[in-house]
Amino acid sequence: MAYPDVYHANDNRYETMPYNRSGNTGLKLPAITLGLWHNFGDDRPLETQREILRTAFDHGVTHFDLANNYGPPQGSAEANFGRIMAKDFAPYRDEMIISSKAGWYMQDGPYGFGGSRKYLVASCDASLKRMGLDYVDIFYHHRPDPDTPIEETVAALDFLVRSGRALYVGVSSYSPELTRRAQKIARELGTPLTIHQPSYSMFNRWIEDELLATCADEGMGVIAFSALAQGLLTDRYLDGVPESSRLGAHKM
């Protein structure tokens, strides 16, 4: 399908997509979010990425989920999204929910991973620069860091909101107990956590044991990643493993 160079969003894009509140907040997210984990790096044609993003937005997908290390290489998904954002979506920024994260390895040295205030603030600044944005709508701590006090990590998230870098903050892959601890600290600081992003699929149902109830009790929304088990729950692998697939490229 040929796409015009100048993008005008579909006028009917909100008619069929359901939108749900995230926890106890007023933030509404679409039932489907587009994650940019593996398919928006420099190993994919930019025009293909552009078509995917346009198609998603035209169908009411307003939430685009990124992280500092998405690619490959690391950082390239945000940079590519920033290019497309500037070309196609700048007039629609107020209609988009853009999220980023930090926590996993991003660069060598002691300041390139984890949950320290140093890493999270610097990473958020770098993500904003790559995407050409003044702020992100949601910023997550990407994974628990046993080497950093949870008080420091949550205080850094609070700072990102108070400094205008993020509107909402959340966590990813936290256990129920750690989620409760983090939310207690966040409430005391005055910036409650809005959302939790765990892995969840028919093959991976760990959040049903306790996390879903914990998030409901704590007023947090839940948004799953890898809901199709990175393609294993589709027909992608019924006839073998294509070399171009994530499994074939050892990206799972």
Language model features: what each stretch is:
Residues A2-T16, P144-M252:
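Beta/alpha (TIM)-barrel catalytic core signal, keyed to glycine-rich beta->alpha loops juxtaposed to Asp/Glu
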Residues L27-I32, G60-T62, A90-M96, L133-D137, ...:
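Short, well-ordered coil/turn segments that N-cap beta-strands
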Residues R44-T48, S76, N80, Y111-Y119, ...:
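Alpha-helix N-cap and loop-to-helix initiation/capping positions
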